Amino acid sequence: MALIEQLVARARADKQRIVLPEGTEERTIQAADRILADGVADLILIGNPAEIAKLAQDKGLQHLEKATVIDPLDHPKKEAYAQLLAELRAKKGMTLEQARVLVENPLYLGCLMIKAGDADGQLAGALHTTGDVLRPALQIIKTAPGITCVSGAMLLLTQATEYGENGLVVMGDVAVTPVPDAEQLAQIAVCSAETAQAVAGIEPRVAMLSFSTKGSAKHEDVDKVVEALEIARRLRPELKIDGELQADAALVPSVGEFKAPGSEVAGHANVLVAPRLEVGNIAYKLVERLGHAEAIGPILQGIARPVNDLSRGCCVQDIYTMVAITANQAIAAKAR
């Protein structure tokens, strides 16, 4: 079964409540109709109900009546959510009046619903920047226990089935933290492993990437990767993780055996952790374009409950897939 089909099947089996705060956006509406038709998730659309109804009628969408539609300007829990936000941000000086204004912002409203237990995850970004999507998530939902660093992982589905997990590789960070320190890099590794388990459904074998393998080069950047490996092992002693490894030593069995003999990860890695954002971002785009891989994501990780960000150039299928991914993350978050 293809990865997307697996994600959809798991989501259907344990339906999660996913908020789409850009509820009047055309691609979002079309994806929502497909999601509801297929039973992938219980959707909460935030937006003007009349506008959503008109869009549904104009596009001939038959399943949107299954969604919960919330008007951000007029709904029963508006005051309760405002009080919750004011409490959460009291140390930052937020007043109740300021909170009442922010609650009318769909991105804030969706995150407050998650915090209050009224929803399980959120997906946005068709109309908003990554910063717009992340800001309320970090202010309201906050990072996961023991995690201070948010990052983004990409699923790369390649035709090179001899590498990774039958051609599937998870790569992080590709989206959020430009120059992680050793502690942050360790957290990126741990969170990328969790994404591999929760979303890809695979047992992670994590390689901490570098231009050096096991001391073949000396540099402060290599030292940071080695330190991050030690921290990651303390955070997750049971995790299969090794480094520092060059990309070929991480992926190619013969090279891994030669350069890092005795490693249970070298030559068999299915999770690749880049030492800095520019490396991860450039690498995944090269694999996608030159290697004709399918790139799915980025999948935000490190937040206590799933909030994901779309590209503003996304298509209907991208939104459909990311809802399924967000639902799988929500299932995993509840199980932790």
Regions flagged by a language model, labelled:
Residues 1-266, 271-336:
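Anion-binding alpha/beta catalytic cores of soluble intermediary-metabolism enzymes, centered on
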